[in-house]
Regions:
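C-terminal alpha-helix
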Residues: 193-200
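Short loop/turn microsegments at loop-to-beta-strand junctions
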Residues: 44-45, 65-66, 165-167
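Thiol/disulfide oxidoreductase modules built on the thioredoxin-like
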Residues: 137-193
Length: 200
């Protein structure tokens, strides 16, 4: 009986934690969307971070528009799904993809080394630029872009995951916000938006 009660308690705790993290993430996601729609303190800005080849990536040094996503290499679901979408966008753009910088910025700088990011992104598309930095550098960029992220311990394991905003941003070469794309937006619609900007 005691074992059964303990088992039920663990199941309940797991369900409660899952629901809490989902609702919390959904709340934060809606927050950035409301901020964009109200045009109040739009996300955006330049950044100077370490690229997956060990060099320095300065967003000011490029005249390309940016397709920007914040995630981490240990992410079990949303990051791989979004990076597959980004790879599809690049392929659909064809030669026009040369006019954009598809960028992945880690929100887990403690684990996401240059090597880890390079190997991880290699599974999706060679054109995706992976960036990392110190925690303070990542905090600064995340704040500028209105991206929340927080470590969450994994119950029963000496490990953690990272809850984070699941949105793709589109910005011009000045780092100014253009648009955002939540998960439900199909890649073909994002490609259309990018082409409209490129061909203006």
């Amino acid at each position: 009986m005691l074992k059964k009660n303990i088992f039920l308690f663990l199941i309940f705790s797991l369900v409660f934690a899952s629901v809490y993290f989902f609702l919390n993430k959904d709340y934060k996601q809606k927050g950035i969307i409301q901020r964009v729609e109200s045009q109040d303190n739009l996300p955006g800005g330049h950044f100077l971070l370490t690229s997956q080849d060990g060099g320095v990536f300065d967003s000011r040094s490029s005249d390309k528009i940016m397709l920007l996503y914040f995630g981490f290499t240990y992410c079990p679901d949303v990051c791989p799904t979004t990076l597959i979408k980004m790879a599809d966008i690049i392929d659909r753009l064809g030669k026009d993809s040369e006019k954009i910088n598809p960028i992945f910025i880690t929100v887990d700088p403690d684990r996401d080394t240059v090597k880890a990011i390079s190997e991880y992104l290699g599974a999706f598309h060679e054109d995706i630029i992976g960036l990392t930095g110190t925690k303070s550098e990542i905090d600064k960029v995340a704040k500028d872009w209105g991206v929340y992220y927080e470590k969450q311990p994994i119950k029963g394991a000496d490990d953690y995951t990272v809850n984070h905003l699941d949105i793709i941003f589109l910005a011009n070469s000045n780092g100014d916000f253009i648009d955002y794309f939540p998960p439900k937006i199909q890649s073909v619609l994002i490609v259309e938006k990018i082409r409209n900007i490129i061909n203006k």
